């Protein structure tokens, strides 16, 4: 499945919630009618079946993290093999992706921009270049901006925007050095309550 390259707001309207695909700290429901489905007239949302609700939740989470369908299914399989709660394991695996950690640290304004920074070899993990967005970041790993990339205006702008966002407790960032430490995996209570991972587990358990 190809990666979606169309308007980001359309995806958020389709899911009926802000997927945080746009930069900035202003909620997108102030920019568009997020409760209306995409289209000129914003078609009314029909009543979804149980399967439809589960599918929508899976699509929502997949789009938030910018993961393709096959990748997402593989993450679920890995989460199911791990000890503990499968849904919480799934979210931790997604949070541990390098592109997501770069976003959480504020080096990229969006996860898509953060993924691009990784792919363009602008990111170091423990002093070494890593250009794989899905690279699994471990506790106490140090993620930083490569020296020759530190003058990029988009990184500086992203750090300014990040100052206005709530800072994750599981990450420590030195904006001046453009360096951060992934202190630990986030607990489920650290993450958004707007995600219902139990619906995803129910979907894949069928």
Curated annotation (Swiss-Prot):
<protein>
    <recommendedName>
        <fullName>Small ribosomal subunit protein uS4</fullName>
    </recommendedName>
</protein>
<dbReference type="GO" id="GO:0015935">
    <property type="term" value="C:small ribosomal subunit"/>
</dbReference>
<dbReference type="Pfam" id="PF01479">
    <property type="entry name" value="S4"/>
</dbReference>
<feature type="domain" description="S4 RNA-binding">
    <location>
        <begin position="96"/>
        <end position="158"/>
    </location>
</feature>
<dbReference type="GO" id="GO:0006412">
    <property type="term" value="P:translation"/>
</dbReference>
<keyword id="KW-0687">Ribonucleoprotein</keyword>
<dbReference type="InterPro" id="IPR018079">
    <property type="entry name" value="Ribosomal_uS4_CS"/>
</dbReference>
<dbReference type="GO" id="GO:0042274">
    <property type="term" value="P:ribosomal small subunit biogenesis"/>
</dbReference>
<keyword id="KW-0694">RNA-binding</keyword>
<dbReference type="InterPro" id="IPR036986">
    <property type="entry name" value="S4_RNA-bd_sf"/>
</dbReference>
<keyword id="KW-0699">rRNA-binding</keyword>
<dbReference type="InterPro" id="IPR005709">
    <property type="entry name" value="Ribosomal_uS4_bac-type"/>
</dbReference>
<dbReference type="InterPro" id="IPR002942">
    <property type="entry name" value="S4_RNA-bd"/>
</dbReference>
<comment type="similarity">
    <text>Belongs to the universal ribosomal protein uS4 family.</text>
</comment>
<dbReference type="InterPro" id="IPR001912">
    <property type="entry name" value="Ribosomal_uS4_N"/>
</dbReference>
<keyword id="KW-0689">Ribosomal protein</keyword>
<dbReference type="GO" id="GO:0003735">
    <property type="term" value="F:structural constituent of ribosome"/>
</dbReference>
<comment type="function">
    <text>One of the primary rRNA binding proteins, it binds directly to 16S rRNA where it nucleates assembly of the body of the 30S subunit.</text>
</comment>
<dbReference type="InterPro" id="IPR022801">
    <property type="entry name" value="Ribosomal_uS4"/>
</dbReference>
<comment type="function">
    <text>With S5 and S12 plays an important role in translational accuracy.</text>
</comment>
<comment type="subunit">
    <text>Part of the 30S ribosomal subunit. Contacts protein S5. The interaction surface between S4 and S5 is involved in control of translational fidelity.</text>
</comment>
<dbReference type="GO" id="GO:0019843">
    <property type="term" value="F:rRNA binding"/>
</dbReference>
<dbReference type="Pfam" id="PF00163">
    <property type="entry name" value="Ribosomal_S4"/>
</dbReference>
């Amino acid at each position: 499945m190809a990666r979606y390259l169309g308007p980001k707001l359309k995806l958020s309207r389709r899911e009926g919630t802000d997927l945080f695909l746009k930069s900035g700290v202003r909620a997108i429901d102030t920019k568009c009618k997020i409760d209306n489905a995409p289209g000129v007239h914003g078609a009314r949302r029909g009543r979804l079946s149980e399967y439809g609700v589960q599918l929508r939740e899976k699509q929502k989470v997949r789009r938030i993290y910018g993961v393709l369908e096959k990748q997402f299914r593989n993450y679920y399989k890995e989460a199911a093999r791990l000890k503990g709660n499968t849904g919480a394991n799934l979210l931790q695996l997604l949070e541990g992706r390098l592109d997501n950690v770069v976003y959480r640290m504020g080096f990229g304004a969006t996860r898509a921009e953060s993924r691009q920074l990784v792919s363009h070899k602008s990111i170091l993990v423990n002093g070494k270049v890593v250009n794989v967005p899905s690279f699994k970041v471990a506790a106490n790993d140090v993620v930083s901006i490569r020296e020759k990339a530190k003058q990029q205006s988009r990184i500086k702008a992203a750090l300014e925007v990040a100052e206005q966002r709530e800072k994750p407790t599981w990450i420590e960032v030195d904006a001046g050095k453009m360096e951060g430490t992934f202190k630990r995996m986030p607990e489920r209570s650290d993450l958004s309550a707007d995600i219902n991972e139990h619906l995803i587990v129910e979907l894949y358990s069928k």
